[in-house]
Amino acid sequence: MPTTATKLKSKPKARPRRPALPPRHPRRTRDEHAQEIAQDYVEIIAELIAATGEARVIDIARRLGVTHVTVARTIQRLQRDGLVTSLPYRSIFLTESGSKLSEESRTRHEIVVQFLESLGVPDRVAQSDAEGIEHHVSKETLQAFRKHLGRRK
């Protein structure tokens, strides 16, 4: 029978090794995050234009819970990327590219929400969760969501 001293000296069982995750490249991560932000902004701009006829920096800031300075900087980047147009102290408008991205983002969001609701997730929660999920779903997964939703009808 082992003594207490030998029990303390015994080595703990080795845990099985987890497979190594593929490396994440910081530049890729930054680019993906920038794309998420662009999608959120063009979606909000489209919603504001549809609801009030214009999208102002202050309205976007309120919707996102950020400062007007943050919005102004992001709008400059979106202008550089050809997604929005604006004049100083004027409303912000979507370009053709911005409108297309907005529509794609809105459709993606709706599919994710419908999929979550089909699993029994309440609407309020599905809307909130979709905001985080929609940017990270591959085209293949989105197509699988559509297929699943089509079978339910």
What are the roles of these predicted feature ranges?
Residues 1-18, 128-153:
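C-terminal regulatory/oligomerization modules of transcriptional regulators
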Residues 44, 74-77, 83, 97, ...:
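Residue-level recognition of specific faces of alpha-helices
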Residues 105-140:
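Arg/Lys-rich, alpha-helical DNA-contact motif
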Residues 63, 101, 118:
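Residues within the alpha-helical elements of helix-turn-helix
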Residues 37-40, 56, 97, 108, ...:
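N-terminal positioning helix adjacent to the helix-turn-helix/winged-helix DNA-binding module
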Residues 90-109:
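Basic, amphipathic "hinge/linker" alpha-helix immediately C-terminal to the N-terminal HTH DNA-binding motif
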